[in-house]
Amino acid sequence: MTAKERYLVTGALGCIGAWTCALLAEEGAEVVGFDFGTDDRRLRLVTHAEIPLVQGDIVDGKAFARLLDEHGITHVIHLAALLLPQIKPDPPYGTAVNIGGTVNVLDAAKTRGIQVAYASSAAVYSTADDVGAAVSNDAIGHPTTFYGVHKQACEGMARIFWAEEQVPSIGIRPWIVYGPGRDNGLTASPTHAMAAAAAGDDYRITFGGRTQLQYAPDTARVFIAAARAATEGARVFHLGGPVVSLTEVAAAIEAVVPGVSITVDEDTILPFPEEFDGAPLDEALGGIAWTPLQEGVSATVERLRAVRA
């Protein structure tokens, strides 16, 4: 980190965004959060630092460009997006936010010498891409949801902005992120189970099988590292991480909170491959340290208990 670094985190009030702001503030970096909403409960859950927040709509490209200049931004971590439950009632606006918003970020970066780290998603793939082994980093996906198609389009836009405008970018494809602040989206059920256990309640995780579970603070650190990495081109990487079964997750929660019952709906399997090859990202960023599952579950339950106290 240099003294001149100043970060803008879009989607700052989401789970990964809140953790990204918190970790940047913790290390003394200058960070500004940007979000359409005003509910800062996730940010307050993960940090006591006073993070400057700007409310705005990522769809307004001119306002976003002014924001970069007003705050002297040197790095953008673009996490703002609408998830599937928010897209389905209004697909045109969801598309404007997810694709148009990313275009606005890249367009604003092109004349300001800013590298962009942005969130893609494992949702750019589907069961059609399940090859019975880890999906390779350069495999072409066949998404089956609005969200997945949006994210695939964002990757394409980043490639065009590099080819035509030389805007460098790194896209990261998270899969199932868990931890404090993860309370929204199709794959939030493991964290919901931890929240239930923290309250002393039983819970049934809504899907089963094996998957890559990515601890939210670890995920945020990857985005920060990606924003700082010297790169040329429009690179995109699977986030990777350890593969675990949802029954292992349930057992880890029960080990932290004896007496609660955490079960798993093994009849429901998410329509995505279970593993993505994270080795290329690990190599590009010089190694990623993953928090062990039991440690991540314990820390999550502890923090959620503290909030209830």
Segments and roles (model prediction):
Residues 152, 165, 178-191, 216-217, ...:
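Glycine/proline-rich active-site loop of Rossmann-fold NAD(P)-dependent oxidoreductases
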Residues 78, 103-146:
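Conserved Rossmann-fold NAD(P)-dependent oxidoreductase catalytic core, especially the SDR/UDP-sugar
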Residues 58-97:
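NAD(P)H-binding glycine-rich loop region in Rossmannoid oxidoreductase-like domains
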Residues 88, 140, 169-180, 192-214, ...:
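A conserved pocket-lining segment of Rossmann-fold NAD(P)-dependent short-chain dehydrogenase/reductase
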Residues 7-27:
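N-terminal Rossmann NAD(P)H-binding glycine-rich loop of SDR-like oxidoreductase domains
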Residues 120-121, 155-180:
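Conserved beta-loop-beta element that borders a ligand/cofactor-binding pocket
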Residues 70, 89-116:
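NAD(P)-cofactor binding segment of oxidoreductase domains
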Residues 201, 206-209, 213-309:
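C-terminal substrate-binding subdomain of Rossmann-fold SDR/epimerase-dehydratase oxidoreductases
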